[in-house]
Amino acid sequence: DSSTQMGPLANQRRIAAMEALIADSKARGGNVIVGGSRCSEKGHFFSPSVVTNVSDDATLMTCEPFGPVAPVVTFDDLDEVLARANKLSYGLSSYVFTESAKTAHSVSTRLEAGMVNINHF
């Protein structure tokens, strides 16, 4: 279907992994504000999901989900952001969105990630 903007996950194990991330986040006080479940029993489609109030010890904060589940967290300063981002085991890719070239350079050089994207996906 040419109008598809998001395809299925690879298999049932990936669906189960997304469900586990959601369950773990909720058990640790997270709030699912959109999505949070598979789209239907047919195929391997999981709803794009956003979780707020995610604790730092939740699996969602310490892994790269490889699926449509994202945490949204608040922070007090850039040092806190960098500490959280650099806590990941893998850090394959990161994204910096800012209007300041100085901030983009400062943050991107301090991120421990394979790829740092600035102001784009």
Regions found by a protein language model. Give the residues of each.
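Flexible, acidic loop-helix segments that line cofactor/substrate-binding pockets
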Residues: 1-20, 37-45, 62-67
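Conserved C-terminal structural/oligomerization subdomain of aldehyde/semialdehyde dehydrogenase
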Residues: 22, 38, 45-121
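A short linear hydrophobic-aromatic micro-motif
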Residues: 32-35
